[in-house]
Amino acid sequence: MSSQALDSAKVAFIEAAIEHGVLLFGNFTLKSGRQSPYFFNAGLLYSSSLLSTTAQAYAKVLSSSRIPDFDVLFGPAYKGISLAAVSAVSLYQQTGKDIGYCYNRKEKKDHGEGGTMVGAPLKGRIVIIDDVLTSGKAIREAIDILKASPEAKLVGIVQLVDRQEKGQSGSGKSTVQEVEEEFGVPVEPIIGLDDIVKYLESSGKWEKELQEVRKYRAEYGVQRS
């Protein structure tokens, strides 16, 4: 793990997530059945202050060299909708880059404008905004939506948290690494497990939690390439 200090956007996001109970430490059973010493609940990202901090962190990643140039943010229903919207606003405020955003309906609308897509036309270079990639099922469903639009080209994915742990496929790779290899696009997080560990180390207030997270990482963790 790099000894480089966390940047201010990551620190602000982690501190806000802890303060609002979005990032929790304890004993949690994941969908995979694993017992995890930490849990990230993106469903609690509903206050204006926390959304602002989250959007700023997204915008920083979106404007970095790690994400190719793009035209539209796509936020998969439901959690991705608000995340894409606030990220588009923050990106414009930070950089002046004027991009569109869109999202899908899970139920097709047969009146008014109709269809399953809302917002900017799904064409050009697309970046998907999501929260946490677990099994990879949801992100593959989102990519299938893009594939149905011949004018859309996926160029990247930005997620809230990379758990940096081995997936369930037996490959020894994380879900993020598998998605990157399968689709040939970068998957960049606002924070990863290494960042959480680094924050706990630097704070000096979470020694018990730090030890548990380190143990979990030693058993299940993978390094980002």
Curated annotation (Swiss-Prot):
Record keywords, A-Z: Glycosyltransferase, Pyrimidine biosynthesis, Transferase
Binding residues annotated for 5-phospho-alpha-D-ribose 1-diphosphate, in chain numbering = 31, 78-79, 105-106, 109, 111, 130-138
> Which GO molecular function annotations are given, in alphabetical order?
orotate phosphoribosyltransferase activity
Pfam families under this entry?
Answer: Pribosyltran (PF00156)
Could you provide one GO biological process annotation from this protein's UniProt record? 'de novo' pyrimidine nucleobase biosynthetic process
Q: Does the keyword Acetylation apply?
A: no
Database matches in SUPFAM superfamilies: PRTase-like (SSF53271)
**UniProt keyword GTP-binding present:** no
Its annotated pathway? Pyrimidine metabolism; UMP biosynthesis via de novo pathway; UMP from orotate: step 1/2
EC number(s) on record? Answer: 2.4.2.10
Q: What does the entry list under GO cellular component?
A: cytoplasm
UniProt catalytic activity: orotidine 5'-phosphate + diphosphate = orotate + 5-phospho-alpha-D-ribose 1-diphosphate
Binding-site residues for orotate, renumbered to this chain:
F39, F40, T134, R163
Q: What does this protein do?
A: Catalyzes the transfer of a ribosyl phosphate group from 5-phosphoribose 1-diphosphate to orotate, leading to the formation of orotidine monophosphate (OMP).
Assembly and partners are described as: Homodimer.
Give the protein family.
Answer: Belongs to the purine/pyrimidine phosphoribosyltransferase family. PyrE subfamily.
Q: What is this protein called?
A: Orotate phosphoribosyltransferase
The scientific name of the source species is: Cryptococcus neoformans var. neoformans serotype D (strain JEC21 / ATCC MYA-565)
